[in-house]
Regions:
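Extended catalytic/binding region for NAD+/ADP-ribose chemistry, centered on the ART fold
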Residues: 94-120, 190
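Active-site and NAD+-binding cores of ADP-ribose-processing enzymes
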Residues: 1-67, 71-96, 121-235
């Protein structure tokens, strides 16, 4: 779908929510930090960790999809911001490629929870997991003040021209659109949530636009099995 059909909207939104597994949270103590070894050995271990850590590789300008000049440094939770762009999933996600990630967030907590719960349950189904599963996430809040391409319907009486980009299963059309917009300098995309009716999500393409990142609540999902909606606890 041509990028020219996606119009821009001035977005000024505080307190968007992104959920990150607590084991990846910025305040989680690293494994290496607990080791008592000579400094020379510790430095070697850090280099080894960096060789297998996409975020570290990106900050060293070793990744093909994003340059170090686009990443951020010296701001709170910059590692969390950079990780969103350097840890690209195999096959990509709705608006990102296998080589470059994006900062996905929701405008409301219920939307963020629904998006995360869907994808986690999908992962459980893929491995035929049939036992109880309890998993915890940390909210990361961020503010956005920029022009984003907007895929939300302007006329509720007409079909969305971006319906194929909001397909619940296929990411082919959405990734093509995102790649086109990214190459044209887009800040990112605002779009209706596919997993929570009436919800709104944002996919930011530029690390520098992810503003004022801070931690929110801890969210725990309890899946009795992968076929049922989880119980959610905010604490």
């Amino acid at each position: 779908m041509p990028a020219k059909q996606a119009t821009k909207t001035a977005v000024s939104r505080n307190n968007t929510l992104r959920l990150i597994l607590t084991r990846y949270a910025d305040d989680a103590e690293g494994v290496l930090a607990r080791l008592t070894v000579p400094q020379s050995q510790f430095d070697n271990l850090l280099q080894l960790e960096g060789a297998t850590n996409d975020r570290v590789s990106g900050e060293a300008n070793f990744l093909p999809g994003i340059t170090v000049h686009e990443l951020v440094f010296g701001v709170p939770y910059y590692h969390i911001i950079n990780a969103a762009f350097t840890y690209a999933r195999p096959g990509g996600t709705r608006f990102s490629s296998p080589y470059r990630g994006a900062w996905y967030a929701a405008f409301a907590r219920k939307t963020a929870q629904a998006e995360v719960a869907y994808h986690y349950a999908q992962g459980l189904r893929e491995i035929d997991w049939r036992e109880k599963e309890v998993v915890s996430y940390r909210e990361y809040l961020a503010d956005f003040h920029a022009d984003f391409h907007d895929l939300r319907k302007k006329d509720r009486h007409k079909d969305s021209p971006f319906a194929d980009c909001l397909d619940p299963v296929s990411y082919h059309a959405s990734q093509r659109l995102a790649a086109d917009l990214l190459n044209k300098g887009s800040a990112g995309i605002v779009y209706p949530s596919v997993r929570y009716k009436g919800g709104t999500c944002i996919a930011c393409f530029r690390p520098a636009l992810v503003g004022n990142v801070r931690q929110g609540e801890k969210i725990t999902f309890t899946f009795e099995d992968a076929s049922r909606a989880p119980k959610v606890r905010v604490h």
